[in-house]
């Protein structure tokens, strides 16, 4: 099955503490979750690793968010949108459902 959300897609958060925020997808995990730049920031308590010269402390990093809680952002309409699939020149491509514009 083809992925509706892929790396480097511009997405908008639909639910949760970061609702309404936009960001770029950094990574898509196989568990149905994605990591989005600047979204769902958590504080991680990190131990120092002297062998690698890494200091310890509290580090902020992006945590995974469920794919169902985000939607792809359509820059043409300025809103969240749904993704469809169709064949163009023998290739399967993604398109926005609202205006039928091909993605990338």
From Swiss-Prot:
One of its GO terms (cellular component) is ribonucleoprotein complex. InterPro entries: KOW, Rib_uL2_dom2, Ribosomal_uL24, Ribosomal_uL24_CS, Ribosomal_uL24_KOW, Translation_prot_SH3-like_sf. Gene3D superfamilies: 2.30.30.30. GO terms for molecular function: rRNA binding; structural constituent of ribosome. Keywords: Ribonucleoprotein, Ribosomal protein, RNA-binding, rRNA-binding. It comes from the Bacteria. Pfam families: KOW (PF00467), ribosomal_L24 (PF17136). Transmembrane segments: none annotated. GO terms for biological process: translation. NCBIfam families: rplX_bact (TIGR01079). One of two assembly initiator proteins, it binds directly to the 5'-end of the 23S rRNA, where it nucleates assembly of the 50S subunit. One of the proteins that surrounds the polypeptide exit tunnel on the outside of the subunit. Part of the 50S ribosomal subunit. Belongs to the universal ribosomal protein uL24 family. PANTHER family: MITOCHONDRIAL RIBOSOMAL PROTEIN L24. This is Large ribosomal subunit protein uL24. It comes from Citrobacter koseri (strain ATCC BAA-895 / CDC 4225-83 / SGSC4696).
């Amino acid at each position: 099955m083809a992925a509706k959300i892929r790396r480097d897609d511009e997405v908008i958060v639909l639910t949760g503490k970061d609702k309404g925020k936009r960001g770029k997808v950094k990574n898509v995990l196989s568990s149905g979750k994605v990591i989005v730049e600047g979204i769902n920031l958590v504080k991680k308590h990190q131990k120092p690793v002297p062998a690698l010269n890494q200091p310890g402390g509290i580090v902020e990093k992006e945590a995974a968010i469920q794919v169902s809680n985000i939607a792809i952002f359509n820059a043409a309409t300025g809103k969240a949108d749904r993704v469809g699939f169709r064949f163009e020149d023998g290739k399967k491509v993604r398109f926005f459902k609202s205006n039928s514009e091909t993605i990338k």
